[in-house]
Amino acid sequence: MRLEQKIAIVTGAAKGLGGAMAQLFAREGAKVIAVDMAPLTYECENVEYYSLNVTDSQACKALTDYAKEKYGKIDILVNNAGITRDAMTRKMTDEMWDLVIDINLKGVFNLTRYVGPLMEEMGGGSIINIASVVGEYGNIGQANYAASKAGVIGLTKTWAKEFARKGVPVRCNAIAPGYIMTDMMKTVPEDLLKKFAGLTMLGRLGQPEEIAKAALFLASDDASYVTGHVLSVNGGMRL
């Protein structure tokens, strides 16, 4: 098993991408703290639910302290929690902008500001930030989401430099998914799904498990020489 005896925190883990990652990590031997405001939609051995709002900095510190006290370390952090509130810029409200930035960007900062230094103290670790193809290329009607995910990419590259500067192997990478068949996508009309699939070289949408497998690689020792990288998992959307 590739994550045996590893301790992992996965945010936004109630379902979807986060749920797929939490369950795969557990099957690969990790003990997983699955973080979300909503209860988990699955049961999985070695996955522990922890209720948390990532916009609350002190709650993020409390989670870090809890994991350290219970397990003595944190090996893997996946910052996956995120939302969308789409609108054209001229119609986007302050509330829509602030909520997306607070959860998608500030939430990533809030948890990593505590977990990253702990990983340095403990001798290493892997931080994986879930970005998006929208953060790389932008998208009409998603100014807030695009800004938040572009910010996540910037944080990833900054932390890859900051947390490794003392010679401690704390790696920080991002995954930029394309169109993935999550519960949110299942509400999209069939004709649009076909259009999205046609934008890829592989002619289909991705599955949550495919993002989870990418995260497993970055979390494992197989990626021991990979840091500061943005791994695009999008079926060849932007070739």
Regions found by a protein language model. Give the residues of each.
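The beta1-alpha1 cofactor-binding region of Rossmann-like NAD(H)/NADP(H)-dependent oxidoreductases
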Residues: 52-62, 94, 209-210
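Active-site helix of classical SDR
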Residues: 112, 148, 156
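Short C-terminal tail/terminal secondary-structure segment
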Residues: 137, 216, 227-239
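Substrate-binding pocket helix/loop in short-chain dehydrogenase/reductase
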Residues: 88-89, 93-101, 185, 196
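Short, small/polar-rich loop/turn modules that mediate ligand/substrate recognition or access, typified
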Residues: 164, 169-171, 226-228
